[in-house]
């Protein structure tokens, strides 16, 4: 069994490869982001001294559920900068969703809303605890934003939900956003 720190390194490597740079290890994603699992394992084995069981453990125990394993194929659940179509069906969101960010970013967000930046979608959480975890990855004073998802949806905005329960949309205009009082972390 790989140590926790090695599991984290493997997870980050696989995420990087599957989301951003499959070409760096000789992989080619299909249009929906899938690669043969055997091919990904070969790439992992060239970088880490681990077993098949170690790689499976990284996938199965990853707290962020970053990977989707289906049969003999694997892909990143979301977060791609390379061109993929995750083939997600539109979904009806809950009344509110949440986004973790920083006070510094909130200034720009108030003007332009939440933008997808280099990703294909804006990522939203179904609960404040997950949003706090996301915010904690950023430097600065953290803040949780509430998204009026049901109102957005009723006004024509599309939402999708990934296998690991991350909600996606193209853009969140600022009129649907408000900071949650006391949610700073």
Curated annotation (Swiss-Prot):
Keywords: NAD, Transferase. Transmembrane segments: none annotated. GO terms for molecular function: NAD+ poly-ADP-ribosyltransferase activity; tRNA 2'-phosphotransferase activity. The keyword Cytoplasm does not apply. Its EC number is 2.7.1.-. InterPro entries: Ptrans_KptA/Tpt1 (IPR002745), RNA_2'-PTrans_C (IPR042081), RNA_2'-PTrans_KptA (IPR022928), RNA_2'-PTrans_N (IPR042080). It is an enzyme of class 2 (transferase). It comes from the Bacteria. One of its GO terms (biological process) is tRNA splicing, via endonucleolytic cleavage and ligation. Belongs to the KptA/TPT1 family. Removes the 2'-phosphate from RNA via an intermediate in which the phosphate is ADP-ribosylated by NAD followed by a presumed transesterification to release the RNA and generate ADP-ribose 1''-2''-cyclic phosphate (APPR>P). May function as an ADP-ribosylase. This is Probable RNA 2'-phosphotransferase. It comes from Rhizobium rhizogenes (strain K84 / ATCC BAA-868). The gene is kptA.
